[in-house]
């Protein structure tokens, strides 16, 4: 179903932006669908196809504008944050809740207007946080503001919904009934968290027994951001130049943010628009990445060491943590092809990095992320967990 709202659903997912926001939302929905709950997704043009492909019923926004996928977030931050906190999104979510009558909502944490709508409708609402929440919470506790909240616009929206204003950034972020963080607590920044903050870890990871490729031709996954980021084409080119001529094979997942025509691809690199990382990673010896949280945690869940070259946002933190865990090497964005080749050679030659990644994989498995998330979400809606 696309665009229709004639039937009820048990859980409504409010999505808007793509990139790293979307996969954990859909993974959370899949966990509920596996419990025989009917899950619907409120989707923009950026998220609709992925939601349909995941098997969910999809309804569209009626008032809210679509996100701008051609511009880096940093270049449109004020506009994007105002839209995400704006009344149009809130009214669309309110209408969807009124018509579909879900028992709970799961909302992208970057959509404060949708969270406010859930509060106004009295629907149990979970904010799905897809980055290390400790970073944001520590910043807000210092009174240094919040990364992604236009509080003035949000309070205008809350006023229109007859809600009290958010007193500060932390109050805005922690207004939902549950903050479900898709990061292991031991990976996040150590700080105090209220009980409503639940660290589950990466959701929907499908691990397999380890499979090693040829020792002479190890396979390396090259995975970068699916959204536009400054410096990304140059980084991908330097990584490809570093790998050219090396005794290895690589698969480059080149998403919609970078055109393949802009990159000189060496003969030992296969380019694909998309790959199922859970199927691919068991064959890989290592991962080269910008350090986005989704790729970082999935590599760790599969016990794969990483070479990380952060582009920005939370990626510096993720790369640093991977290094502290002994599971990766962290290089600056401007590293040369020679420096990248040298670091990758060390990563593949020194077994300590693979051992560090295996320890992280065991820790993630012990956390039981899917069960933790399912229990938290069903508990929020007071649905019996079996």
Language-model regions, residue ranges each:
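Donor-nucleotide binding loops and adjacent catalytic segments primarily
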Residues: 5-7, 188-286
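Short amphipathic alpha-helical surface micro-motifs
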Residues: 39-41, 108, 160-165, 179-185, ...
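Active-site-proximal region of nucleotide-activated glycan assembly enzymes
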Residues: 126-195
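Short flexible/disordered coil segments
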Residues: 168-172, 228-237, 313, 317
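Glycosyltransferase specificity loop/lid
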Residues: 1-156, 246-301, 307-386
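Flexible, active-site-adjacent loop/turn segments at secondary-structure boundaries
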Residues: 185, 198-201, 329, 362
